[in-house]
């Protein structure tokens, strides 16, 4: 069976093989009541920054505590970041379509997401909405990371305007990066684009 992936509780960074970690709150409740993790099952705890703790469940919802799960660390893995960094620049969209794009891109392996306030966007982030929107996208990326069993959570960058995005694209290409624009009227398929060799990106 494919192991479940959860966010670890405090102490994960210093955890060693044989240590016991306890998850509480909504993360543990979801694992116990929805995913129904049982004693003896494998669960991976990832911190979103490359640390993966391969664990074995030793207690799940004991004594009626459905918001508590304890696991023993069996293996500690530090997963390196991808050599080629993929960034999704996503225009704000209504009806949650932008969040769906963030979720799908995370599952496909994107390393960062940049929100873009295009001039013709119906959806607009202003004032307090900027922080709320970024937090919502970050939560979406975090959940999608667990769903895809990744060890790295994509970071959600600052909101860009079209002008600042143009500057970002120029800086990216000047430093050897490749920028692909996905457009419904594009004639060239994305599969035909030559990407940089990972060895050249070190």
Question: Over which residues does each language-model region extend?
Answer:
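Surface-exposed, flexible loop/turn segments at secondary-structure boundaries
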Residues: 51, 121, 187
């Amino acid at each position: 069976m494919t192991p479940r992936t959860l966010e670890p509780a405090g102490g994960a960074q210093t955890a060693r093989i044989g240590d016991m970690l306890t998850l509480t709150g909504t993360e543990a409740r979801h694992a116990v009541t929805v995913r129904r993790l049982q004693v003896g099952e494998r669960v991976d705890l990832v911190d979103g920054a490359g640390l993966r703790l391969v664990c074995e469940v030793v207690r799940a919802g004991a004594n009626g505590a459905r918001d508590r799960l304890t696991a023993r660390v069996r293996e500690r893995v530090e997963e390196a970041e991808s050599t080629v960094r993929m960034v999704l620049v996503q225009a704000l969209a209504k009806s949650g379509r932008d969040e769906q794009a963030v979720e799908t891109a995370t599952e496909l392996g994107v390393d960062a997401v940049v929100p873009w306030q295009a001039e013709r966007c119906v959806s607009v982030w202003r004032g307090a909405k900027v922080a709320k929107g970024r937090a919502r996208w970050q939560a979406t990326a975090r959940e999608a990371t667990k769903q895809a069993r990744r060890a790295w959570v994509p970071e959600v960058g600052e909101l860009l305007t079209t002008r600042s995005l143009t500057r970002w694209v120029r800086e990216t290409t000047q430093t050897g990066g490749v920028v692909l624009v996905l457009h419904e009227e594009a004639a060239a398929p994305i599969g035909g684009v030559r990407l940089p060799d990972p060895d050249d990106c070190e």
